Amino acid sequence: MTTRIDQFSAPAPAGPVNAWIVGDDEEVIVIDPGSDAAGVLDALGDREVLAVICTHGHADHVAAALEVAERDEAPVALHPKDRSLWRDAHPGEDADIEMEDGGVFEVADVRLEVIYAPGHTPGSVCLYCEDLGAVFTGHVMLADGPAPQDGEYPDFAGQLNAIGEYLLPLPADTRVLPGQGPETTIAMAEKNFDSWVAAGPGLGG
């Protein structure tokens, strides 16, 4: 069976967010399920969910996490530094797995490596799948630059550092699959990086 990446667009107040489904016809991992649990579950069909991974704790990315995971009793993974953000969406609940830099998830015949990349939030992570030539960047990096939060950057310098230190060294043809908007490549991000630095925090305005 061929391992593939499927995309599901989940509605959100600031515009649709990208839920990513990685796996084959038997089993999958769901990345950032958004807020439309019914829509994600419909897209999954009868494929088994091995894990639900949240790249960060903002509600528009994690609201459906528990409901999607519950169907197959799958664990939910989140970096512990985003626990307080997670609890805004899920009071009294905790994620099952506390992700760390370098952690690995396996699904079908591929591996997803956790890249700790704080800046957008204290616990933001990316997930690199060398086997499929893709990196899932959440809101660390969109096609047009670092993702703001409500038009502002809590830690613009930290976010740029995460991009420059952890993402740009990946192979140039790596697909960048963000938490919102269209995909891009590492090559395009590297080409645009200096302009993002020059624009500063006003980039998101």
Model-derived regions: residue spans:
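Conserved beta-strand hairpin/beta-sheet module of binuclear metal-dependent hydrolase folds
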Residues: 1-47, 126-138
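Short beta-strand or tight-loop elements
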Residues: 3, 108-113, 123
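A generic secondary-structure signal marking the coil-to-beta-strand transition
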Residues: 4, 18, 27, 95, ...
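Hydrophobic/aromatic beta-strand patches that form the interior of the parallel beta-sheet core
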Residues: 6, 53, 77, 97-99, ...
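Short Gly/Pro-enriched turn/cap motifs at secondary-structure boundaries
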Residues: 10-12, 96, 116-118
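Active-site HxH/HxHxD metal-binding segment of metal-dependent hydrolases
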Residues: 14, 28, 35-111, 141, ...
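Residue-level detector of beta-strand structural context in well-folded domains
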Residues: 18-20, 97, 102-103, 125, ...
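Metallo-beta-lactamase
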Residues: 28, 116, 122-205
